[in-house]
Amino acid sequence: MAENKPFRGPIRANTDRKANRRGAARLAAVQALYQMDIAGAGINDVLAEFESHWLGNEVEGEQYLPAEAAFFRDIVSGVVRDQTKIDPVLDTALERGWPLQRIEAILRAVLRAGAYELERRKDVPAKVVVSEYVDIAHAFVERDETGMVNAVLEQLARQYRGDEMGPK
């Protein structure tokens, strides 16, 4: 697997469309889940930190795109609440010999958030969920890992929303 890249970066865009706010919320959720995994930070502290210091604010000279705060909270809280259900599903979807705990922390965060959204957020098209989390992964890992993210999330999309995904 690739070396972990530094995990900071502005959430920027020229427009404040709902899709951009949701994309920013997804990226912030992955960052928050990563922080919780690596630093052992608690959910309340992480939610408060991101909502007061990161989302829509200027940090170290970079303007972060406003994120849909309720969507951000739903993803982070949902992953934490459902993690004991999400992790075994991801372990099954991953290749044999690569359990979830063996992959990079950033990929765990991406996969957990994507799995949660695929299972629980039926208001978001499955293909959008897969595409968004593959794009997020691409910002931090090499192409091989983004391919793995795509394969795992597509497998889960077919499992949770087969009718929506259509034939293989």
Swiss-Prot record:
Q: Where would you find the membrane-spanning parts of this chain?
A: none
InterPro entries of this UniProt entry? NusB-like_sf, NusB_fam, NusB_RsmB_TIM44
For this UniProt record, give its keywords in alphabetical order, as a comma-separated list: RNA-binding, Transcription, Transcription antitermination, Transcription regulation
Question: Could you mention a single GO BP entry for this protein?
Answer: DNA-templated transcription termination
Q: Which GO terms describe its molecular function?
A: RNA binding
Please provide one cellular component term from the Gene Ontology annotations of this protein.
cytosol
Task: Tell me its family.
Answer: Belongs to the NusB family.
State the protein's purpose: Involved in transcription antitermination. Required for transcription of ribosomal RNA (rRNA) genes. Binds specifically to the boxA antiterminator sequence of the ribosomal RNA (rrn) operons.
Q: NCBIfam families, per this entry?
A: nusB (TIGR01951)
Protein's UniProt name = Transcription antitermination protein NusB
Instruction: Identify the species of origin.
Output: Bradyrhizobium sp. (strain ORS 278)
Tell me the classification of the organism that encodes this protein. Answer: Bacteria, Pseudomonadati, Pseudomonadota, Alphaproteobacteria, Hyphomicrobiales
The gene is nusB
